[in-house]
Amino acid sequence: MNKQSWLLNLSLLKTHPAFRAVFLARFISIVSLGLLGVAVPVQIQMMTHSTWQVGLSVTLTGGAMFVGLMVGGVLADRYERKKVILLARGTCGIGFIGLCLNALLPEPSLLAIYLLGLWDGFFASLGVTALLAATPALVGRENLMQAGAITMLTVRLGSVISPMIGGLLLATGGVAWNYGLAAAGTFITLLPLLSLPALPPPPQPREHPLKSLLAGFRFLLASPLVGGIALLGGLLTMASAVRVLYPALADNWQMSAAQIGFLYAAIPLGAAIGALTSGKLAHSARPGLLMLLSTLGSFLAIGLFGLMPMWILGVVCLALFGWLSAVSSLLQYTMLQTQTPEAMLGRINGLWTAQNVTGDAIGAALLGGLGAMMTPVASASASGFGLLIIGVLLLLVLVELRRFRQTPPQVTASDG
């Protein structure tokens, strides 16, 4: 029973009722947000026939999410985390109701969509940081890798299902149905979350919120270990922005519309396989080195992706990137939670998640700029190999992360 399997162990859902409640709430929430993610751009495009207006809504929501992550990190370290989670979810649901009512109007308001996008982006991310900060208390730090892998699998599964449901709803009932069901799903998530135990933050001195946030920044910059993890996370997210080149590369490979879907599915599929085969990751004696090497491997996969002579080989490279990035992300998540003091968990999780959001935006902008000067193939390769060079430099510079050793957690009978 003590022999560890490569496959993900789902026993945490059975042994930890609080984590099971979070699992259910997260899955329903991801599906709800997926319905929203399909409806908003479609509605704006139908109203304005402007891709710029669609892009503006995404940018505004992303900006609100960034602010929400910063504020949420401070709140999660100051107030009872269960209350922050419930407040954020409930308030987010009110915004979805607003979008539904607006969609039912004879002439929906574009301004209302933008404002409610700001509202929902802010409050959705507010709850994310509180939930991340509370996870070690819910499952125990020794189970964080397992919890992270289960969460990743949930996110990937929900991200595949929700756009399909959203598309069917748009085809049959219109955007109001998407918004209405997103609101209903969000309020349903409150039911399992109400069963969570009290999650008080650790005692700490009262200080101005900005000063508290700056303390989080200082900790991140002063810690070679935690700061290095956050930096790798940002670079990895930048690499995933290669999806903006898919349409152009599809033309280069002369792919059909049906085949293009394989490009978009490859990274989530690889990541799901990475999560499913993460059973032994928690028992790695040198997680920092493994994180660095898996990140380098993922950059190499992106560099090779655009050079492939056939699209099917490109899909294999993307799936490999998904798998390696999943390994790196799980190690990042676990080390961040275990190496950050309890009193800082909210702020550091907020900053880590925020740099993932900004990393994706920066990566997309850089690839867009490269695409204006180079061919799609050259752009994809330049981004991958450029990040690979930066990664090799970080492998040499981040000595503390590279040499970090941990005592593998003890395997209990329930784990096997």
Curated annotation (Swiss-Prot):
Upper lineage: Bacteria, Pseudomonadati, Pseudomonadota, Gammaproteobacteria, Enterobacterales
Keyword Nucleus: no
Periplasmic side: 43-55, 105-109, 178, 240-256, 308-313, 378
Protein name: Enterobactin exporter EntS
Gene source species: Escherichia coli O157:H7
Transmembrane parts of this sequence: 22-42, 56-76, 84-104, 110-130, 157-177, 179-199, 219-239, 257-277, 288-307, 314-336, 357-377, 379-399
Family that this chain belongs to: Belongs to the major facilitator superfamily. EntS (TC 2.A.1.38) family.
PROSITE patterns: MFS
Membrane topology: Multi-pass membrane protein
Disulfide bonds: none
